[in-house]
Design a protein with these regions (language model features):
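Extended, low-polarity transmembrane helix blocks
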Residues: 1-22, 64-136
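Solvent-exposed, well-ordered loop and adjacent helix/strand elements within mature globular domains
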Residues: 18-47
């Protein structure tokens, strides 16, 4: 396995571990101040419990090679909701954006086709060729 793939897998495992152990488990377990924190965000603890389950599912999908792309798309959507929630209540919102970027970078390092799609836009070859001739 190449060094690039190893780095991608290390980032992926660390990210999934963070999602499961630092984020989802906080939604699934009881702790002091949990209800107040979630109420500030506009969610009750029942909804947060369900979100924790979904978060674990997405983290697992992200780690399985056959479902990693869909898992990353779902993770991005989930983190978009987290970003919007934090913006709405005036909390710092950069963390979910950084996590989403790390997820896409990790997936791209694991599977170079992800970066290829982003850079080469394979489904718009004519448009890309026109843009390339204009810039030269």
């Amino acid at each position: 396995m190449s060094k690039t793939k190893v780095v991608g897998w290390v980032l992926s495992v660390l990210l999934a571990a963070f999602l499961i152990f630092a984020s989802a488990l906080g939604k699934l377990t009881e702790w002091e101040g949990k209800q107040d924190m979630f109420a500030k965000l506009g969610w009750d603890t029942g909804v947060m419990y369900n979100i924790g389950i979904v978060e674990i599912g997405i983290a697992v999908m992200f780690l399985i090679p056959r479902t990693a792309f869909v898992g990353t798309v779902l993770l991005t959507a989930y983190l978009g909701g987290a970003t919007a929630t934090h913006v709405r209540v005036g909390d710092p919102f950069i963390a979910p954006i950084v996590v989403a970027l790390v997820a896409w970078i990790a997936l791209g390092l694991r599977d170079g086709r992800v970066f290829g799609m982003a850079i080469h836009c394979p489904n718009c070859q004519v448009a890309c060729d026109k843009d390339a001739t204009r810039s030269t």
